[in-house]
Amino acid sequence: MSDTARISGGSFTSPPGRDVELNSFKEASQTRLYPYSSRKEEEGREDEQQRPEREEDTGALTGYKLVLVTVGLCFCIFCTSLDNTIVATAVPRITQQFHSLDDVGWYASAYLLTTCAVTLPFGRLYTFFPIKWVYLSALFVFELGSFICGITPSSLGLILGRAVAGLGGGGLFSGSLLIITQCVPLRRRPAFSGFIMSIFAVASVIAPLMGGAFTDHISWRWCFYINLPFGLVSAVVIFFTFQTTKPVVQASLREKAAGLDPLGTATFLPAIVCLLLATQWGGAQYPWGDGRIIALFTLFGVLLACFVGLQLWARERATLPPRLLRGRNIWGSALYGFCLNGAMFTFVYYLPIWFQAVQGTSATESGIRNLPLVISNVIFAIISGVLVSATGYFGPFMLLSAAMASIAAGLLSMLHPSSGAGEWIGYQVLLGSSIGMGFQLPVFVVQTTLASTDIPTATALMTFIQLLGGAIFVSVAQNVFRNQLAADIRAALPMLDPKAVINAGPTSLRAMYSGETLTTLVAMYNDAVVHTFYLAIGLAAASFLAATVIQWRPSPKSISHPDSS
């Protein structure tokens, strides 16, 4: 046969050896773009997805540079986490100034919607472009949104600013964890990541307290101005201290564009927006049977089906390569984080309501009474990170965390109007310890069991899942709370308008009612809050079941590094 391809009957036959050449070229191209992933695409087993046992930590920092980067990342996480809940106590003053009561729901949801929607696509940006510049770009967008919120003269401007801030915030949480992977050797990574992630929980708890203090003593605009100096410090530290590294995946511009999965992103973003709008509006702003809610859920289902189909078709170039979800450690960790975060945010939102409505504290005092939850969370996040670093195991700590969270949720559901400090302090310490121990572990799993090329996408996935769990179940808890309180009022106090009582808020209860009516309403508030805690019990128990699928296998600890002893 000649060296020239022959055409016979409309068929093309390659010369000898050409098929081998073409196949080798295709394999080499895919390996260049996805050097770890392509070899394992059809396997999906955890033990085959584990990163090499020895991997150079060439970008690791030590001394004051490591301290500066850690502080800078903490500032970023603190600011983005504050924005989740800080606006809650400022809403009454904002609506009074802008005469915008109908826009109240958008002040919180605009930030949440864009944050959740862009978190997963940011994983691809971190894969194909230098982490430093993607991170600083996200920080700039977040700061721009905060600046718009601070100076806006209108309600529409505030909503726009919140949405812009969310676009940047969606890339900062996962980006902070990725910078840690670049700066800290693997054996020390859990301790650093645990401390940084504990800042998220701390900021989420104290944000309403800070928002109330700014609103009462300075201006509600400082709820957003506060982000500017913190963000500036973070930007300066990251710019001068964190060295620019090559992208995780080396590829041409065309390959990068394909790897960003524009079609998948175009279906994923509106799908998440539809889901979150439906869960936030349903039962609160509109009845669940309202055409708008049904349409949103329908659109979500259609868009999600399109997204899944596109991911299966795109495979390695997908926003979320299907291969990543085949390993039980990955999908088990995702389910664990989804449920545990949902339980945590249920308590973050409704424990202050219990203090204010049932025990008659002010918003500021309720924040102070949440300190046992905050302090225990931080302490056990650090302890958990150190123990995981020392033992190399994360499975046992995930089980212990979920078991403790289930017990703590059950104990908190036993609170009543006459509960003493010993009860609510002790129960919060147990809850904070359990959440602190397990909150960061899903990220540890992906960062210690996957190849380096998969870490940005998998880290973004875990961040997205945790944010989504909090967003969805806070909305579910809100509906449980409102429906239970309204039902109790209609049954025992038919002369009162349930909507008026709910809209008045927990801090106005004692100013509006007295005597037997107040006593009855306090008991009803207690009952409604406890029903949200029942939801948290179920979520904590579900996280325990998810933790049972995680393999008890030591993660790599011995990483070669010039600074290692």
Swiss-Prot record:
The chain crosses the membrane at residues 59-79, 103-123, 128-148, 164-184, 194-214, 222-242, 257-277, 293-313, 335-355, 378-398, 399-419, 425-445, 457-477, 530-550. PROSITE patterns: MFS, SUGAR_TRANSPORT_2. It comes from the Eukaryota. It is a multi-pass membrane protein. The keyword Hydrolase does not apply. Residues 1-57 are annotated as: Disordered. Its main location: membrane. Pfam families: MFS_1. Coiled coil: none annotated. The keyword Transmembrane helix applies. Residues 1-14 have a biased composition (Polar residues). It is found in: Cell membrane. InterPro entries: MFS, MFS_dom, MFS_trans_sf, Sugar_transporter_CS. Residues 38-54 have a biased composition (Basic and acidic residues). Keywords: Cell membrane, Membrane, Transmembrane, Transmembrane helix, Transport. GO terms for molecular function: transmembrane transporter activity. PANTHER family: MAJOR FACILITATOR SUPERFAMILY, MFS EFFLUX TRANSPORTER INPD-RELATED. Belongs to the major facilitator superfamily. TCR/Tet family. Efflux pump; part of the gene cluster that mediates the biosynthesis of aurasperone B, a dimeric gamma-naphthopyrone. This is Efflux pump aunC. The lineage of its organism: Eukaryota, Fungi, Dikarya, Ascomycota, Pezizomycotina. The gene is aunc.
